[in-house]
Amino acid sequence: MSHGASSRPATARKSSGLSGTVRIPGDKSISHRSFMFGGLASGETRITGLLEGEDVINTGKAMQAMGARIRKEGDTWIIDGVGNGGLLAPEAPLDFGNAATGCRLTMGLVGVYDFDSTFIGDASLTKRPMGRVLNPLREMGVQVKSEDGDRLPVTLRGPKTPTPITYRVPMASAQVKSAVLLAGLNTPGITTVIEPIMTRDHTEKMLQGFGANLTVETDADGVRTIRLEGRGKLTGQVIDVPGDPSSTAFPLVAALLVPGSDVTILNVLMNPTRTGLILTLQEMGADIEVINPRLAGGEDVADLRVRSSTLKGVTVPEDRAPSMIDEYPILAVAAAFAEGATVMNGLEELRVKESDRLSAVANGLKLNGVDCDEGETSLVVRGRPDGKGLGNASGAAVATHLDHRIAMSFLVMGLVSENPVTVDDATMIATSFPEFMDLMAGLGAKIELSDTKAA
């Protein structure tokens, strides 16, 4: 499938032992929020380790369009924020490119302001559902103009005075939770979010760090109630962004699968809401050693030493899905080389990611000789530990559907399979992991971009 003039295929080939020590780019979730909260806070915020992928930069541009001053000195991003309640009406539509996180969180942040703000994005983002964020904003008094099915472009206009709400999040979505809390920042009174299934909690931790009056209670059933007092003061902070666990997954799984590998990955975010993949791989028999666990900016961080391992199939508990929703594509690749079947359930959220990620993974696996079954919300992969016959000798390419995680996952597969694996486009890897190709090559991975851009 062509993605227009700028797509560029890539091919990965069987590689021998990967080795080295690498530092992963900063966490995407924390990077988005660093720009947003720094832009909103009073005074100066300084950020090191920021993920400089296109998605995060688009969030920074949106904050600049609403009055924040952002500059870079050396490795440090310096933000002069507008003060809570001080965002200015953007003069042009806010373009978030491929970034659902930046788009949905900013809708919450600015939607309750008494002016018009318009949100646009690329072809992939324009297909994704925004109603999950727009519905609670409507309850707070926000007027919404959107395309059919609550898709982009979307224009929001807040009321003179927003209404605080108590909102029970209907699906496991940190973006919905965060959007409501961010809307609550500029709403008088207490905004309450009830979360039946815990999702990544960076918004809560970081807002507390910036000085918001925010409390979290968890009941006996694990239901979390988050209360935020609106219109309080946020104060600029110093943030060192830890390495993204979702990006860590690619060199980590490659090191587990390529025989003779020994790779150390530094400064990885180990927040318990994000470590579902590591836990699952350990259950499969992965040799992952957690070194030097420490706290940095209120978050758990550690270094990981990963050695090639013999994996066995497992059934992944459904309730683990929120803590590893972005990691199922690379888990499916690991499962393709495990002994026996790996069963993954509760995958409905994968159908509304950058692509229908579930069918994209299943189709890519089948194209490369893997025995798998795709259900409505499940995937079963039966592995072949020696990789015999896997890959695609004819060079047929996996359709990535503009999805960076599909591209990286299948390039990892090609490092282990008997035949090469080709993806139809690797350009969008830059949205989350611009250094991927160089970092993997430095460890000894054989991945080549095609010389010709696809038409």
Swiss-Prot record:
Residues that coordinate or bind 3-phosphoshikimate: S29, R33, S173, A174, Q175, D326, K353
Activity regulation info: Is resistant to inhibition by glyphosate (glyphosate-tolerant) like other members of class II EPSPS, in contrast to class I EPSPS, which is glyphosate-sensitive. Is much less sensitive to inhibition by the (R)-difluoromethyl and (R)-phosphonate analogs of the tetrahedral reaction intermediate than the representative class I EPSPS from E.coli. Is highly activated in the presence of cations, such as NH4(+), Rb(+), and K(+).
One Pfam family this sequence matches: EPSP_synthase
Record's compositionally biased regions (Polar residues): 1-19
Stretches for region Disordered: 1-25
Catalysed reaction, written as an equation: 3-phosphoshikimate + phosphoenolpyruvate = 5-O-(1-carboxyvinyl)-3-phosphoshikimate + phosphate
Positions that bind phosphoenolpyruvate: K28, R128, Q175, R357, R405
Record GO cellular component, one term: cytoplasm
Example GO BP: chorismate biosynthetic process
SUPFAM superfamilies on file: EPT/RTPC-like
GO molecular function: 3-phosphoshikimate 1-carboxyvinyltransferase activity
Biological pathway: Metabolic intermediate biosynthesis; chorismate biosynthesis; chorismate from D-erythrose 4-phosphate and phosphoenolpyruvate: step 6/7
Superkingdom per UniProt: Bacteria
EC numbers on record: 2.5.1.19
Keyword terms: Amino-acid biosynthesis, Aromatic amino acid biosynthesis, Cytoplasm, Genetically modified food, Herbicide resistance, Transferase
Active-site annotation: D326
Similarity-based family: Belongs to the EPSP synthase family.
PANTHER family, per the entry: AROM/DEHYDROQUINATE SYNTHASE, PENTAFUNCTIONAL AROM POLYPEPTIDE
Function text: Catalyzes the transfer of the enolpyruvyl moiety of phosphoenolpyruvate (PEP) to the 5-hydroxyl of shikimate-3-phosphate (S3P) to produce enolpyruvyl shikimate-3-phosphate and inorganic phosphate.
Protein known as: 3-phosphoshikimate 1-carboxyvinyltransferase
The organism's taxonomic lineage, starting at the top: Bacteria, Pseudomonadati, Pseudomonadota, Alphaproteobacteria, Hyphomicrobiales
Gene: aroA
